[in-house]
Amino acid sequence: MFGRGPSKKSDNTKFYEILGVPKSASPEDLKKAYKKAAIKNHPDKGGDPEKFKELAQAYEVLSDPEKREIYDQYGEDALKEGMGGGGGGHDPFDIFSSFFGGGPFGGNTSRQRRQRRGEDVVHPLKVSLEDVYLGTMKKLSLSRNALCSKCNGKGSKSGASLKCGGCQGSGMKVSIRQLGPGMIQQMQHACNECKGTGETINDRDRCPQCKGDKVIPEKKVLEVNVEKGMQHSQKITFEGQADEAPDTVTGDIVFVLQQKEHPKFKRKGEDLFVEHTLSLTEALCGFQFVLTHLDGRSLLIKSNPGEVVKPDSYKAISDEGMPIYQRPFMKGKLYIHFTVEFPDSLSPDQTKALEAVLPKPSTAQLSDMEIDECEETTLHDVNIEDEMRRKAQAQREAYDDDDEDDDHPGGAQRVQCAQQ
């Protein structure tokens, strides 16, 4: 991140005044002043939360030699421009705890009551349409980090740890470079000495089981209950089963259902759709067929006597759709979409037989004179989707050609003669 030192030096005394020390104060003087004022103004003892925050912000800047140098030279504005907050990016309770650990008041501090929450772990879970129709149980084996049982997540045999000297317990380091007059570059990164934990453990005191890492890998088997009627993208949550870490509220493991396509049935919410093709005879004279449902039942589907099924029509069967989630005895509808298959041609005898039983044409027969006055046409078969696709492609190509002509008006580019 880049920042430009202000041309007019801003206030560089405020942080010293907050701590009540002179600008020449030593690091030890800063520590003493902060500890005394922080205990007095701690919110758990009825102190002013804003004052407590200001003390932490001031001490965080002045206790860091590099930040203090920038503050003394350019003032608070330089830190704001370079770091986005005047050096107050850390929780004031973290800074306070680095002095007193669990707190000087014999109880939990406000910081301890607000433990950091670990990240949730999200896994996609593929399920079939049969799985969410019938319901199923899936056992899944997962790896996660668990607190070391030998040291209770302390990382050491004694349970003690030391504040990292490289980052003063903050877990972060700031690198600062001078790029030019009034230009500085500041970058914040995890401390490489403590890996961002703010603590170090004596090599001789390291836990023999976790080697000081505080956590160990473990295998965990979860039984995931996929209930009837669950939807695509619905979540199944196992609270507190994600990676464990010290002083952290464990996150959740979340499974997100990914419903696979079914070769026969299509699902839309609580309803199911299926395609069925009838011959022209079946559409006109009646039909019956067997449909195997998702649970293996055989459904007899048949038309009513004298019923004619039109092309592209739908029929519905109540209570044969999807079970409704958490109301498994209620179901949506099963819709059947009918397509009618017509013969490619008819013989003269077939045509006469059909004319004898089918309704007469709605349009009157044309006379020979009327036919003679008309222009004769020829019909040919066409795949309308392919036809439209070809037309769209031709239009795109023509549009591209127009763009090329606009780039080179008048056809080929002319070479300009140099003036004599």
Swiss-Prot record:
Coiled coil: none annotated. Signal peptide: none annotated. Residues 376-420 are annotated as: Disordered. Residues 377-390 have a biased composition (Basic and acidic residues). One of its GO terms (molecular function) is ATP binding. Roots, shoots, flowers, siliques and cotyledons. A lipid is attached at residue 417 (S-farnesyl cysteine). Binds 2 Zn(2+) ions per monomer. It is found in: Membrane. Its cofactor is Zn(2+). It is a lipid-anchor. Induction: A heat shock at 35 degrees Celsius for 5 hours resulted in a 5-fold increase in levels. PROSITE patterns: DNAJ_1, DNAJ_2, ZF_CR. Farnesylated. The modification Cysteine methyl ester is found at residue 417. CXXCXGXG motif repeats lie at residues 148-155, 164-171, 191-198, 207-214. Zn(2+) 2 binds at residues 164, 167, 191, 194. Transmembrane segments: none annotated. It comes from the Eukaryota. A zinc finger (CR-type) spans 135-219. One of its GO terms (biological process) is regulation of ATP-dependent activity. One of its GO terms (cellular component) is cytosol. Homodimer. Plays a continuous role in plant development probably in the structural organization of compartments. Belongs to the DnaJ family. A/I subfamily. This is Chaperone protein dnaJ 3. It comes from Arabidopsis thaliana (Mouse-ear cress). The gene is ATJ3.
